[in-house]
């Protein structure tokens, strides 16, 4: 009997999850990929990995300090 009750509880949990998922807006993968590609192309100019930061503005550039040891 306990096994039967566990199956019923699991089925109820599954039904509740499906009720939540039925209201989710979905889109085709091709549409999502096209939107993502358009977003990336639009924002590419602001991405430092695509268009590098000029050396004069780069806070992580080498400082090139020269030390002489006597």
Swiss-Prot record:
Keywords: Cell membrane, Lipoprotein, Membrane, Methylation, Prenylation, Transducer
Molecular function terms from GO: G-protein beta-subunit binding
Gene Ontology biological-process annotations: cellular response to pheromone; G protein-coupled receptor signaling pathway; nervous system development; nose development; social behavior
Residues with PTM Cysteine methyl ester: 67
Pfam annotation, one family: G-gamma
Location in or out of the cell: Cell membrane
Major localization class: membrane
InterPro entries given in the database record: G-protein_gamma-like_dom, GGL_sf, Gprotein-gamma
Propeptide: 68-70
Lipidation positions, renumbered (S-geranylgeranyl cysteine): 67
Annotated Gene Ontology cellular component terms: heterotrimeric G-protein complex
Job of this protein: Guanine nucleotide-binding proteins (G proteins) are involved as a modulator or transducer in various transmembrane signaling systems. The beta and gamma chains are required for the GTPase activity, for replacement of GDP by GTP, and for G protein-effector interaction. This subunit may have a very specific role in the development and turnover of olfactory and vomeronasal neurons.
Oligomer and partners: G proteins are composed of 3 units, alpha, beta and gamma.
Family in the record: Belongs to the G protein gamma family.
Protein's recorded name: Guanine nucleotide-binding protein G(I)/G(S)/G(O) subunit gamma-8
Annotated organism of origin: Rattus norvegicus
